[in-house]
Amino acid sequence: MAPSIWGVLCDKRVPQKLKGKFYRTTIRPAMLYGAECWPTKRRHVQQISVAEMRMLRWICGHTRRDRVRNDDIRDRLGVTPFEEKLVQHRLRWFGHVQRRPLEAPVHSGILSQDSNVKRGRGRPKLTWVEAINGDLK
């Protein structure tokens, strides 16, 4: 990121609510770009959540040694957990896909599955439709 962004986030004179707003409007959209199409694994969501919390702690001026709860930091900055936003984005995209006509290219790429394709050994990869079904539960 540009040094000017870090200057805003590190400056102690900038109110924390404003830092949270800045985070929600610039940094989080960059992290979530294209996330509606990802069939994410728990490990990926966990890694991104850890990176997000590290950044939020840094914005507040706290470290892990300060033993401040994650929920308290999120409340101070007015930020919701990454996983909730990821589910929102995925379900919003699912609504767009559902409203498209059946001959639209998005239907052939996402919702159709080739049953005659041989899959490799091991656990089958999570598909986008399976991720949506998990979000709807």
Q: What would you call each of these model-derived segments?
A:
Residues M1-K137:
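Short linear motifs embedded in intrinsically disordered, charge-biased segments
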